[in-house]
Amino acid sequence: MKLVKAGIILFTERYEQCITFYRDMLSLPFISATPELTVLAFDQAYLMIEKGGVSSSTQKIRNQNPTVLRFNVANVQEAADELRVKGVAVEVKTFSWGVIGAFTDPDGNRCELKDPF
């Protein structure tokens, strides 16, 4: 199999809010849209945001959503500060293996900033 492009499909309940979050807050470039889904560039892959998911007012626990959307950045603290200015609550944590900045999207899906490998 020769992979042409990879993608992630994110089923959402708060569809419009999630589009705004990923497009405007995280600056993922717009690719295309239909009434039921929106596709944004996700580095060399794509993030397809679709209707039909279930939201949570708090961060979903792992058995509700065992996936984390990871955004590798040059500097976690700087990226976290940029998101905070836009109103995104980011918790920066340091581990022996690196630094992350954890936050959630409008549906309660966990996302993380990560320093380079």
What are these regions (language model features)?
Residues 1, 81-117:
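Vicinal oxygen chelate
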Residues 1-19, 67-69:
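N-terminal beta-strand motif that seeds the catalytic metal site of vicinal oxygen chelate
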Residues 14-28, 85:
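Amphipathic alpha-helical segments
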Residues 21, 39-41, 82:
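Alpha-helical scaffold elements within enzyme catalytic domains, especially in hydrolases
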Residues 27-33, 88-92:
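Short secondary-structure junctions
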Residues 29-64, 110-116:
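Conserved short beta-strand elements that form part of the metal-binding/catalytic scaffold
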Residues 38, 67, 99-101:
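Short beta-strand micro-motifs in enzyme catalytic cores
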Residues 67-80, 87:
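Mid-chain, well-packed structural core segment of small domains
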